[in-house]
Amino acid sequence: MFNLHGKETQNQIDPFHHFMLIKTYQQEFDWLNPWNKKDVVTRSGVASVVKTGKGKLMLLTSADLVANATLIEARRKNASLPSRMHLNRIDHALNLALLESSEKSFFEGLKALEWEIAEKGEAELPVLNPGQKKPFQGEITRLTVGHRQVRDTWLPILQLSLKEIPPQGSIVIQKQKAVGMVLNGSQGNHNVLPLQLVKGFLTNGTGIEQTGLAHRGFQWKSFSQPSLAGFAKIPENLEGVWVSRVLPYGTGSEVLNVGDYLTHIGKWELSREGQIEHSKWGNVLFDALFLEDLEPGQEVELSLYRKGKRLKLTTKVGIYQENGNRVPMKIFEKPPRYLIRGGLVFQELTVNYLEVWGQNWQNRAPLRLRLFKQLDRSRIEKFSKLKNLKNQDQERIVILSQVLPDAVNIGYQELRNLVVKRANGRKVIHLESLVEALKQPQTGLHRIEFLPGSERVQVVLPVVELAKADARIKNNFQIPRFQSL
């Protein structure tokens, strides 16, 4: 039970020594009109006092709560005014963020949380409301694996049964020790990031989006019909999973092939559902091994069947990395990249832009754009065995997103979402290449070609008229700058 009067005993802790409310003012960029920002949205949640690997006190909260925030405020108990906090580190794969204060006295009287590994059983969450004298009571029921779509990560997650809906960033307590942080959920069931992942973030990360997260290096499917065993040249009724895709990072990515039938990771046997028998949590997806059984850099043996032959391959536990897609995952804290010439607005295709069509963009966005996101999967598969992906990672899909009406672009003003192929005869692989191509017009004209299937094959702009046209457009649409790279 929590004592709200500042006194802490062996069996109870004062939440105001360890937690505080924060308020954020988030302002996302407008990816449809990339020179603008959207309206400010305020959000509230909880931050916890933690000690980093260097021994410094900071506040821990969720990345979702502080992403794209122009202002972050934390209010200590009895403080007349909130204190401004600054983002020190953020990890969107884990949904964690660290905040620091420029006030030297901010952390005086505060205490860092003590942590412990979670177990099945009763749990509680602190309440920072003077009218609520008791913490929320819940129960950790099991360990499962969740998918963090914003970064395509698979994470071991604790399931918390709780009637109330806690604030974002709330910490789960067992035996007066922190065991994890609430990520999301609905009334009755919540996902909790376990201690092991939180501690890894506190001690290993060194900057923005710096994850040392042990992670799988492949996607898999199960054989739903035993009759497929003959087709795959594996023994009938053999437990295991079929490798359907190899990632360019993570455990097994350097040795596995598409079509391999994986039966063991180390000493753990895989079921047809991808589960292992965990000594503490019972049947759970094999990703749970990356919580504490398998650490980054550790050698592990993979047992599998490949084209009918049984193999044992040794590899090292790999970590999650940004995957170098031509259509990048959701971008935070960075403005959109764009270029405007003659009213033609060029952007690089991103998930942020696709989300202009809403959360269901996979079905609502233009098909030609969605296909490039799907094609990224086969591209990753193709290049996953290459040692140097640096040059490949720089490639992007450049689109003509819209046309700002002006006399110079009459006839083109209804064009939307066309994929740029070439400009002035030069291949366009990112916005920088488009900028360079537009420095070399052909016979006084800029010729921009699009991929087949578009409403137009090409557009033509007269070079001599562009300077005056750009000045008119800049004034008419109040655009601060025509280029952001």
Predicted regions and their residues:
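Short glycine/Trp-rich loop-beta-loop segment that forms part of the substrate-binding cleft
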Residues: L113-F136, E333-V345
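Soluble extramembrane regions of membrane proteins in the secretory/endomembrane system
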Residues: Q149-T153
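Boundary at the C-terminal end of the N-terminal hydrophobic targeting segment
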Residues: G6-N11
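Catalytic-center loop of serine/cysteine hydrolases
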Residues: F106, Q187-V192
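Hydrophobic or amphipathic alpha-helical targeting/insertion segments
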Residues: A69-L71, M85, G121-P126, G131-R142, ...
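A short, Trp-centered hydrophobic/proline-enriched beta-strand micro-motif
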Residues: D14-P34, A123-V127
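Conserved, short, structured surface segments that act as functional micro-motifs
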Residues: F136-L143, H190-N204, A437-L438
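C-terminal recognition in membrane/secretory proteostasis and scaffolding
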Residues: F2, Q27, N36, G45-S48, ...
